[in-house]
Regions:
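Catalytic-core helical/loop segments in enzymes performing group transfer/polymerization on anionic/lipid-linked
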Residues: 1-270
């Protein structure tokens, strides 16, 4: 069996052309590859990064309250897709996004910030930080309902994922060891719905913000995937501030050079 190193994972993706697998216009492997690699590592070396936990009832209520705030920013120059990871400044006590706060002050801009660890640190008083709790609330609720009622569309998507991704998961079992079919197929179907809902939400934001440039802090966030797709559709340039390359084993920051996908930004600002 092979070890689940990033080099072996990239070689596996290249051999099986994983990132080119497309269902309903979505490159479904690419949208879930971080979690796939994490699942392999969890079953083999027992180590993962960034495992997501479900939202509690109180967290969902708080998100719903945050979601009531309307989006009022129009015709901005730069739209930042923040990652919600604010660091407390020991001198000022203010929680700062070290990757985009300062540069955002220099432009007519807005920072979209999704919940981090199911919440938000108090931002730094800037009036251009907008919480995207509405789409996080919508996606969590929608996916729970879709799982419960197992609609015809979900059944069709499950069949498509089983057909196209199932053989790749079998190959993972052969090369890396773990059998991930039962766990990952429904999770990948869930991800398709997350993208559906997030893309619709982000489209409404773009209608108002009408940015000249979109800068993503973490391209593997749902809003970043959706904004990259929309940017390609609408002719809006997208770029990622690739701070993550400081961690060369961190799966999402590594792609094979030949993988040019609509879900990825146009440029990397390293």
């Amino acid at each position: 069996m092979k070890e689940p190193t990033i080099e072996n994972f990239l070689a596996f993706e290249r051999e099986h052309k994983c990132n080119q697998i497309e269902i309903e216009g979505m490159h479904v492997w690419a949208l879930y590859r971080y979690e796939i690699h994490n699942a392999i590592k969890a079953e083999t070396v027992g180590r993962t990064e960034g495992d997501a936990q479900g939202f509690t009832k109180s967290e969902l209520i708080r998100m719903a309250i945050n979601a009531l705030k309307p989006f009022t920013y129009k015709n901005v120059d730069v739209l930042f897709i923040g990652n919600g990871r604010r660091t407390k400044n020991a001198d000022t006590g203010i929680y700062e996004d070290i990757y985009c706060d300062e540069i955002a002050k220099k432009y007519n801009s807005v920072i979209l910030e999704h919940p981090e660890n199911h919440g938000h640190c108090t931002p730094n008083g800037m009036d251009n930080v907008y919480f995207t709790d509405r789409v996080a609330f919508q996606t969590n609720l929608a996916v729970k309902l879709l799982k419960k009622f197992n609609t015809k569309k979900r059944q069709q998507r499950t069949a498509a994922v089983t057909e196209k991704i199932g053989p790749i998961l079998d190959a993972i079992k052969t090369e890396f060891g773990p059998d991930l079919r039962e766990k990952l197929i429904p999770d990948i179907v869930d991800r398709m719905y997350y993208i559906d809902i997030t893309k619709k939400y982000c489209g409404k934001i773009l209608d108002k913000a009408n940015p000249k440039l979109i800068i993503e802090i973490c391209y593997y966030a749902m809003e970043s995937y959706a904004m990259s797709m929309l940017g390609h559709e609408r002719g809006i340039h997208t770029a990622e501030y690739s701070h993550g390359f400081a961690f060369p084993t961190h799966t999402p920051m590594q792609y094979n050079p030949e993988d040019h996908l609509t879900e990825l930004p146009d440029d990397e600002l390293i």
